[in-house]
Amino acid sequence: YKTLEDLKKDILNNLNTAKDKKIADIKSNSLLTQLIEKYPFEIPESMLQAELNGRWQMMAQQFQTTPEDLERMIKASGQSKEDMLKTWTGDAEKMLKSRIIVDTLIRDRNIAVTPEEIEEEYKKIADGNGITVEEVKKHYADPRSKEYLIDDAKEQKLYKGIFEEIK
């Protein structure tokens, strides 16, 4: 930063961006919670078990260990893997139901994003992180990462459309 004023502007911009993101997250989570309550449906047990297993694997990665060693560590602390998975079940079900609702709405509303919209996302990411668009594109050169960005852009487009409809 060249001046204290530049620093202040950047801090204010970052705070506003974080605030806007938090508000959008709260609104979308509230919407999904209401939809789950209004339109209840069951998740197949196999889907729930796959999600819980994925969370267990991720936790093992975070502890930089194997799932088997993680289970031994959990047992040594007086808990069990089964008890831990039970505590995760409610959140896992809500997340899966939310994902199904979002995917269904995106499909039913034929929501797609154009290459121009993805370019705009690259620019927003670059501006928000103080890096170049080329650096952002390099990160998203991996097809999986780019697919995640595209899915996120579709989801944001869905929420924007829904919130415009209910104003």
Predicted feature residues:
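Extended, charged alpha-helical "arm"/coiled-coil substrate-binding scaffolds
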Residues: 1-167
